[in-house]
């Protein structure tokens, strides 16, 4: 049965059919059509992300998508999900998540969407709703609340100015803020770090690029490093082996092996930095479609013409090395190597994101390599 609101012609339906999923995916492009900074995600990629057979997130999570309709017209959407791998912050608290929020600027639409998602979570024993997560903390996270004047980088979201206030009207408050930093070729590592870099790597430290000939093994090494490095961060949820394989498959056509740098200490994998070409720069005019000619355009722009911007979505050093003198320098050595390579390949700007506001070590690194905070994404929470 549809979820009926007090507005007689406004209802919420659970997404059950391929046709309804198609409507769910298509809605944000229509809602944001007049926003010059909106970039429509690829429909094929979004379909895979929201289909249990192609997204291993569903192996450990329960998900329900909802569409809000008015008079036969789609006016909003939201997801509700429970990730069984999510650690609970305190005893007696059970978090459920919401995500994929997009709606017309109408309080009634936001109200019926959140009521549907909250009722679904409450019926499954959840005590709090946290989000947005699209769909997990290891994917797109947070609602854009500051920095609306530029397009989003690859795998980052973009939301209208009214979205944050509308969510807060539903009783949600800030749980965490996530920062995005911009940097260009004029930025560099701090002078004191530069002096150490110029002296060369100390004994036992090795920097190397991604080896595509053993790509799957390299992605497993990357996941091992990041699962360890991030394990004490707020909201940390480990990436599973199946998710690692899916990550490897999805990034293989996009990643540039020259822009992925591993570090080793005494023969052990210790850290990693990934510069990811900004695919959004290449798909901005494709309107989410790869057929009939979108694939050719995308590959030509990425592999031949090249894009000028990149994002650093992944950076970390294993905890056992973080307090040692060599370990503390690893981010700067890796950043220097990958940044210099990116600039030599024609990139002129990049984003470091997302960085937890509370992660002072990482905000310090971002600022000390020339990064300027220019976007804020907010994760909200509400007691149910």
UniProtKB/Swiss-Prot annotation:
Compartments, as annotated in UniProt: Cytoplasm
Instruction: State what the entry records as the consequence of deleting this gene.
Output: Deletion mutant cannot form bacterial ceramide. Mutants are impaired in growth at elevated temperatures but are resistant towards the antibiotic polymyxin B.
InterPro entries documented for this protein: Acyl_CoA_acyltransferase, BcerS-like
GO biological process terms held by the UniProt record: sphingolipid metabolic process
Q: Which GO terms describe its molecular function?
A: acyltransferase activity
User: Gene Ontology terms, cellular component aspect?
Assistant: cytoplasm; membrane
The pathway it acts in is: Lipid metabolism; sphingolipid metabolism
List its EC numbers. 2.3.1.-
Catalyzed reactions per annotation: 3-oxosphinganine + a fatty acyl-CoA = N-acyl-3-oxosphinganine + CoA + H(+); 3-oxosphinganine + tetradecanoyl-CoA = N-tetradecanoyl-3-oxosphinganine + CoA + H(+); 3-oxosphinganine + hexadecanoyl-CoA = N-hexadecanoyl-3-oxosphinganine + CoA + H(+); 3-oxosphinganine + (9Z)-hexadecenoyl-CoA = N-(9Z-hexadecenoyl)-3-oxosphinganine + CoA + H(+)
Does the keyword Transferase feature in the UniProt annotation? yes
Q: Which domain of life is it from?
A: Bacteria
Database matches in SUPFAM superfamilies: Acyl-CoA N-acyltransferases (Nat) (SSF55729)
Additional free-text comment from the UniProt record: The bacterial ceramide synthesis pathway operates in a different order from that in eukaryotes. Furthermore, phylogenetic analyses support the hypothesis that the bacterial and eukaryotic ceramide pathways evolved independently.
State the name under which the record lists this protein.
Answer: Bacterial ceramide synthase
Organism of origin is Caulobacter vibrioides (strain NA1000 / CB15N)
């Amino acid at each position: 049965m549809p979820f009926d609101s007090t507005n007689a012609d406004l209802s919420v339906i659970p997404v059950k059919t391929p046709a309804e999923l198609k409507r769910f995916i298509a809605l944000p492009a229509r809602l944001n059509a007049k926003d010059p900074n909106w970039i429509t995600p690829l429909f094929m990629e979004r379909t895979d992300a929201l289909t249990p057979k192609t997204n291993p997130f569903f192996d450990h999570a329960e998900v329900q998508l909802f569409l809000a309709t008015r008079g036969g017209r789609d006016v909003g959407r939201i997801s509700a999900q429970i990730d069984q791998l999510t650690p609970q912050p305190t005893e007696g608290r059970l978090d459920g998540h919401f995500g994929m929020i997009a709606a017309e600027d109408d309080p009634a639409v936001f109200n019926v969407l959140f009521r549907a998602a909250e009722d679904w979570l409450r019926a499954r024993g959840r005590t709090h709703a946290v989000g947005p997560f699209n769909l997990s903390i290891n994917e797109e996270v947070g609602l854009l609340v500051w920095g609306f004047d530029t397009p989003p980088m690859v795998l980052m979201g973009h939301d209208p100015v009214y979205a944050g206030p509308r969510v807060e009207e539903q009783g949600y408050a800030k749980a965490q803020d996530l920062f995005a930093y911009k940097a260009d070729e004029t930025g560099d590592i701090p002078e004191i770090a530069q002096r150490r870099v110029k002296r060369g790597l100390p004994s036992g430290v090795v920097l190397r690029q991604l080896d595509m000939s053993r790509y799957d093994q390299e992605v497993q090494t990357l996941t091992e490093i990041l699962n360890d490095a991030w394990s004490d961060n707020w909201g940390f949820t480990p990436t599973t082996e199946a998710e690692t394989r899916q990550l490897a498959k999805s990034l293989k056509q996009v990643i540039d092996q020259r822009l992925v740098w591993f570090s080793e200490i005494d023969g052990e994998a210790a850290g990693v930095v990934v510069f990811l070409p900004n695919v959004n720069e290449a798909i901005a005019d494709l309107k989410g479609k790869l057929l009939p000619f979108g694939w050719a355009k995308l590959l030509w722009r990425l592999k031949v013409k090249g894009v000028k911007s990149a994002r650093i979505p992944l950076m970390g050093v294993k905890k056992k090395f973080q307090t040692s003198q060599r370990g503390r320098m690893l981010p700067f050595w890796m950043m220097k190597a990958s940044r210099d390579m990116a600039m030599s390949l024609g990139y002129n700007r990049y984003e470091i994101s997302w960085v937890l506001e509370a992660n002072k070590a990482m905000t310090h690194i971002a600022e000390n390599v020339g990064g300027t905070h220019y976007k804020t994404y907010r994760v909200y929470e509400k007691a149910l």
